[in-house]
Amino acid sequence: DQGIEHSAGASFAPNPLYFDPANIVELALAGGCNAVASTLGVLGSVSRKYAHKIPFLVKLNHNETLTYPAMYDQTLFASVDQAFDLGAVAVGATIYFGSPEARRQIMEISEAFARAHELGMVTVLWAYLRNPGFKKDGVDYHVSADLTGQGNHLGVTIEADIIKQKMAENNDGYRKIGFGNTNKKVYDELTSDHPIDLVRYQVVTSYMGRAGLINSGGASGQNDFAEAVRTAVINKR
């Protein structure tokens, strides 16, 4: 959904052939991808030709950037039934946990995921945190293991089959910011400063890996420790 989240020009002007949705799907096929995730419009425009060649995942909501002044909210652009009708096997959505809009987003996506499961579709949640208060004393706790872990836990509560989460880079967000509830054992026994342990806690809060976890982001270069050893060896802890 880069064309919505970052604008079509910003996303595709460097490689104009990707203004054509067919080329996005062709790239996924050539790259051996196991699915292609995009918007209702992108996938719907080429579904007759490609839906039987590679699994489609329709992203249901987006944060569009044409609103001025800029705001951060996930708005539903598509329904589960629209995704199903074009031949998609999965739907995805983003919730900005911690934001003022989170409660509404939770209700919307919980309802959408319930419908998707009625139709036998897979559900994927981008369980991202967003609140300016999550930055304190120069530290960005949007990537704290305890807070992202709770985002994961909320996501699996509405039956996300797969959670997409930013890689944890620090910990102790609850206590440093001074809100919510936690337990000393989270920091003394269940985690350490090691990147793999931070990822393990994200897996633990995803029902001990019963829901799959995909990490994105993390520190650049060698600091990502091979993406925290491929998300703690593909969620086997």
Language-model features: locations:
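Alpha/beta enzyme core
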Residues: 4-213, 222-237
